[in-house]
A protein has these predicted regions:
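A conserved active-site cap/scaffold subdomain adjacent to cofactor or substrate pockets
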Residues: 239-240, 244-285, 290-294, 298-310
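Structural motif
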Residues: 2-3, 32-35, 63, 130-132, ...
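A conserved regulatory-domain signal marking ACT and ACT-like small-molecule sensing domains
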Residues: 280-446
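Glycine-rich beta-alpha junction loops
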Residues: 39-41, 138, 218-220, 265-269, ...
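Nucleotide/pyrophosphate-binding catalytic subdomain
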Residues: 1-254, 259, 419-420, 439, ...
Length: 446
């Protein structure tokens, strides 16, 4: 069975990075790889902010990168593709007051992945690895919810099998852009930020691969964000549940939606470092590693807003919570943490763009309070099950920091709370010192 190899934006950021990707893929030729790539680092943001005056620089970057990697007819073909992409983006930017602004946005940003996949395929061929660019819109079929489309699994799996299986069986490496798909009518859509991981997982599930590899710029999943805790360590192995919790609550090396297709099809997911390909990274599978540690990692998420709804109507009433959550459902806003009392509900969310409309509806249910500038900290580990005293250690370690919205997941593998954003780095550093640095020293002393 084949494997899927997904390379993020930093892994295809420039000519040297793309050369490195070609070397990594070449070493896996015997495993029948399918390659998924993100747009070059920074390109998606640049396309989202594009104006007629700024887009020339975006496409010049692609051409300049190609000139370092290709020559002759290969370079000419890619240059034509870049020219066509720029022409199409300029036309899209000229649309005045589009009836579906998000659909236009999806079409514009899709060119980042289209160009990076074309360039990667061309470099692989030039380096002796037979490869072919495949338009991901022929494989990933979605609903019509632009900028955050949901895949239609039956159609996507069937199309992926039809498009990719003959290539894989013939020894050809398919190269696809992640993040993008199309409706049944062929209209371009995108899967939302981080969607390239999701693309890789969907393709892996469709082809029933042995392993999905996510190549990024860090060596696997770490015990904390290395930008906050420089001494954070790589975790050798995580269970699907642990990885899902960490991804959802801020460990950005893995998109949360990546896990579900892997779980449903019992596919291992390996997170690797494209700058250090010799390292094994982190393997995510059904079982966690056997470890003396109760806690595997500490994740955090900033930019969180807390919403509190207070109403005496909650007392002994049926249907209040349903009405409350339906408001968020209508606005397609995901809730992170929820706590309830007899007369109030507090919840956190990291997408506050629809908040004014949401608050207007919530005020029909009760008094609404808003707290911005908050952060979520999530302590994760299968060892939390049945281990007494973890919460006490956490709160003792950060006893001078105000904590709210304390929650333990139903799976009992995560413990989550909310604090002021200004103190999140301090809190994460202290907790890592308590549960990793100190515990490691104690284990060595035994």
């Amino acid at each position: 069975m084949p494997i899927v190899m997904k390379f993020g934006g930093t892994s295809v950021a420039d000519a040297a990075a793309i050369e490195n990707v070609a070397r990594i893929v070449a070493t896996e030729r015997a495993a029948f790889p399918v390659v998924v790539v993100s747009a070059m680092s920074g390109v998606t943001d640049a396309l989202l902010a594009a104006t007629p005056a700024s887009i020339a620089a975006i496409f010049s970057r692609h051409l300049a990168t190609a000139e370092q990697l290709l020559s002759g007819s290969e370079l000419e073909r890619f240059a034509e593709l870049v020219k066509s992409a720029e022409t199409q983006v300029r036309a899209l930017l000229q649309i005045q007051n589009p009836s579906n602004r998000k659909a236009v946005q999806d079409s514009i940003v899709s060119f980042g992945e289209i160009l990076s996949s074309a360039l990667t395929a061309a470099v692989l061929n030039l380096r002796g690895v037979e490869a072919r660019q495949v338009d991901a819109r022929r494989c990933i079929i979605t609903d019509e919810e632009h900028t955050s489309a949901a895949p239609l699994l039956r159609e996507s799996f069937a199309r992926t099998e039809d498009e990719l299986r003959p290539l894989v069986n013939g020894g050809v490496v398919p190269v696809l852009g992640g993040f993008i798909g199309a409706t049944l009518q062929g209209v371009t859509t995108t899967l939302g930020r981080g969607g390239s991981d999701y693309t890789a997982a969907l393709i892996g599930a469709a082809l029933k691969v042995d392993e999905i590899q996510i190549w990024t710029d860090v060596t696997g999943v770490l015990t904390a964000d290395p930008r906050v805790v420089p001494e954070a360590q790589t975790i050798d192995r995580l269970s699907y549940s642990e990885a899902a919790e960490l991804a959802y609550f801020g460990a950005k090396v893995l998109h949360p939606k990546t896990i579900q297709p892997a779980i449903e099809n019992s596919i291992a997911v390996r997170i690797c470092n494209s700058r250090m390909p010799q390292e094994r990274g982190t393997l995510v599978g059904p079982q966690s590693e056997t470890s003396a540690r109760t806690i595997k990692a500490i994740a955090h998420k900033t930019g969180v807003t807390v919403v509190q709804i207070t109403s005496l109507r909650m007392l002994g009433a049926y249907g209040f919570l349903r009405a409350l959550f339906e408001v968020f459902d209508r606005h397609r806003v995901v809730i992170d943490v929820v706590t309830t009392s007899e007369v109030s509900v507090s919840l956190s969310l990291d997408d506050a763009s629809a908040l004014p409309s949401i608050v207007e509806e919530l005020q029909q249910l009760g008094t609404v309070g808003i707290e911005k500038g908050r952060a979520i900290i999530c302590v994760v580990g299968d060892g939390l099950r049945g281990t007494a005293g973890i919460e006490a250690r956490v709160f003792s370690t950060i006893s001078d920091i105000n904590v709210s919205l304390i929650s333990q997941g139903a799976s009992s593998i995560n413990f989550t709370f909310v604090i002021d954003e200004e103190r999140v780095k301090e809190a994460v550093t202290r907790l890592h010192e308590e549960f990793f640095t100190r515990d490691n020293a104690q284990n060595r002393a035994r």
